[in-house]
Amino acid sequence: HRGAPMARYDAGSVSRRTAGWLASRGTGPNREIAADLSTVLDRSRDLARNNPWARRAINAIVNNWVGSGIRAQWASARRQKRWTGWFESTDIDADGRLDGYGLQSLIARAVVESGSALIRKRPRRMTDGYSIPLQIQVLEPDWIDRAKNELTIDGGYIVQGIQFNALGQRTHYWLYPEHPGDQTHRHSMISQPKPADEFLHVYRIDRPGQVHGIICACGCSMTCTTQCLSGSVKAPASWPSCATLSPETPPSRPVRSSRNSSLD
């Protein structure tokens, strides 16, 4: 008498079809990211610069996420006017180039192209003349010292440049004084801890415990590259579905400066 055949998963079988499937065994999310993130970032940005399908996908995803801008509606007319005077001017941008809607688009583009973005809150003095004494600075993930991994004397730990306390809560980001790819030799490239409450770290969490983001298109980057090099004019089937919505750049808004806008 033979027993019933054991149920199996096709993905776990060993056969001719799976002979070339070399999957890593039980790696954690941060170990996987640490091994390949720098290379993935470089290749993603190369695609964004040189591949028309990649540029189209990035523009479409950004357009899908934020369009011409996500608006805030306040119940108070006075607060609405004050908010609008700040958010719809370059006062909001620490670099003085974009309004709030432009920053939304920039953040979305950084997340798509680089896997994540750091949003830094930069408080200002009331005497600086801004309608709201706060500016927003958008940083690429390269600013984080991902080579920094160690234990701290208070029972915490640092994983790829992000410091946690003994409870596993983020307390600091270890940042370089400038983008490591734009070294001007004005600074010593030694990372320093910055309080975590000054930042919003925007990225998609694919696995529990993941501390850094990875680009959403990393699984189809090779497909895109191969098809474009072979002369194919058809977009890769594995490209993110929202990339087929529109090839246009998100609609732009007029940017105005309101350094001395009325608060009344």
Regions found by a protein language model. Give the residues of each.
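Structured, contiguous alpha/beta core segments that scaffold functional sites
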Residues: 1-60, 69, 99-102, 108-264
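Low-complexity, highly charged intrinsically disordered N-terminal segments
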Residues: 62-91, 103-107
